[in-house]
């Protein structure tokens, strides 16, 4: 069986399968392309052509899982939170800045220091590793764990929405 025949036979059913699991149509199309690239690369290694249907759907399922896994890790917090300091700055941004800075103070020292140096003072994670005398991967882990802990604390006390660039677009302190 060649890739063109597989495309003719499977592209519509796979597109439907992916669409039931992913809402964004452009992502559906991207994932479908990735699936067929994987099929093309690994087709010569297929041992039992009788099981090609389940093989193709397994590739599709794993591709969707990989998509959500990478999406989840990239959504923890943006690399840097940006605060608009213009004269017409909205009140919630000021409140959010105060809330986030005070919440960061509740973090363990090593995470607090990592976030203050990277997110507020603008150091790169490489510069952070040099300043603290730790490995680069250690610095990356420390920043990521700090952001995770900060997110947990903030989710318990505040509602914060950020756009895809990390700009705060909505903020409210939750009633206790």
Swiss-Prot record:
Annotated gene: sigZ
GO terms of molecular function: DNA binding; sigma factor activity
PANTHER family: RNA POLYMERASE ECF-TYPE SIGMA FACTO, RNA POLYMERASE SIGMA FACTOR SIGZ
Organism per entry: Bacillus subtilis (strain 168)
GO annotation, biological process: DNA-templated transcription initiation; regulation of DNA-templated transcription; response to stress
Alphabetically ordered keywords of this record: DNA-binding, Sigma factor, Transcription, Transcription regulation
Motif interval(s): Polymerase core binding: 30-43
Family: Belongs to the sigma-70 factor family. ECF subfamily.
Function: Sigma factors are initiation factors that promote the attachment of RNA polymerase to specific initiation sites and are then released.
SUPFAM superfamilies listed in its UniProt record: Sigma2 domain of RNA polymerase sigma factors, Sigma3 and sigma4 domains of RNA polymerase sigma factors
Protein name: RNA polymerase sigma factor SigZ
Lineage of the organism: Bacteria, Bacillati, Bacillota, Bacilli, Bacillales
DNA-binding residues (ranges): 125-144
Superkingdom of origin organism: Bacteria
């Amino acid at each position: 069986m060649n890739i063109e025949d597989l495309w003719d036979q499977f592209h519509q059913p796979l597109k439907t399968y992916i669409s039931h699991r992913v809402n964004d149509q452009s992502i559906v199309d991207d994932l479908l392309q990735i699936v067929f690239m994987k099929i093309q690369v690994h087709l010569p290694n297929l041992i039992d052509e009788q099981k090609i249907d389940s093989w193709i759907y397994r590739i599709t399922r794993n591709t969707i899982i990989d998509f959500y896994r990478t999406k989840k890790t990239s959504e923890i917090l943006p690399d840097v939170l940006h605060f608009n300091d213009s004269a017409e700055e909205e009140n919630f941004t000021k409140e959010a800045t105060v809330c986030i800075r005070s919440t960061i103070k509740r973090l363990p020292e090593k995470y607090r220091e990592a976030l203050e140096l990277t997110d507020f003072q603008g150091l790169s994670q490489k510069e952070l590793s040099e300043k603290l005398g730790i490995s680069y991967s250690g610095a990356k882990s420390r920043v990521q764990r700090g952001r995770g802990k900060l997110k947990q604390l903030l989710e318990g006390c505040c509602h914060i929405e950020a756009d895809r660039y990390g700009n705060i677009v909505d903020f409210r302190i939750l009633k206790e």
